[in-house]
């Protein structure tokens, strides 16, 4: 919840993604408030620094990506499992209850921009 303290971030989710060295590392997905015109890279760097300052470097939190919106079910539950599978490059069952299927493509593209899925 600490990520929320940044005034530019409207919503966020953190999922554990596969990592060759550590087994799993946290990856943040940030949805910015509308009208934020600061550079995404700057905001990501601030959020990562803020989390590391709060939780400590043991959190291994180094990466976050900005997305338009979080994938949710129609009842509002964040589809973290699906986000993890996209980041890990795994096949995933299409979530029948997803609110807007187009968002999964947006997430795939956003993840590609920071090098996910990692190729073996």
Where are these regions (language model features)?
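Short, small-residue-biased leader/transition segments that mark boundaries at the very start
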Residues: 1-4
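Short beta-strand-to-loop capping motifs
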Residues: 30-34
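Conserved C-terminal "lid"/linker of ANL adenylate-forming enzymes
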Residues: 13-20, 24-29, 44, 48-120
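Short, conserved charged micro-motifs
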Residues: 36-46
């Amino acid at each position: 919840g600490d990520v929320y303290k940044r005034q530019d971030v409207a919503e966020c989710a953190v999922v554990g993604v596969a990592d060759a060295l550590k087994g799993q590392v946290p990856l943040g997905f940030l949805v910015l408030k509308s009208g934020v015109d600061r550079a995404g890279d700057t905001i990501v760097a601030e959020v990562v620094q803020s989390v590391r300052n709060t939780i400590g470097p043991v959190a291994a939190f180094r990466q976050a990506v900005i997305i338009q919106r979080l994938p949710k079910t129609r009842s509002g539950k964040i589809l973290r499992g699906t986000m993890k599978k996209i980041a890990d490059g795994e096949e995933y069952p299409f979530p029948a209850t997803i609110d807007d299927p187009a968002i999964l493509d947006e997430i795939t593209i956003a993840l590609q921009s920071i090098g996910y899925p990692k190729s073996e």
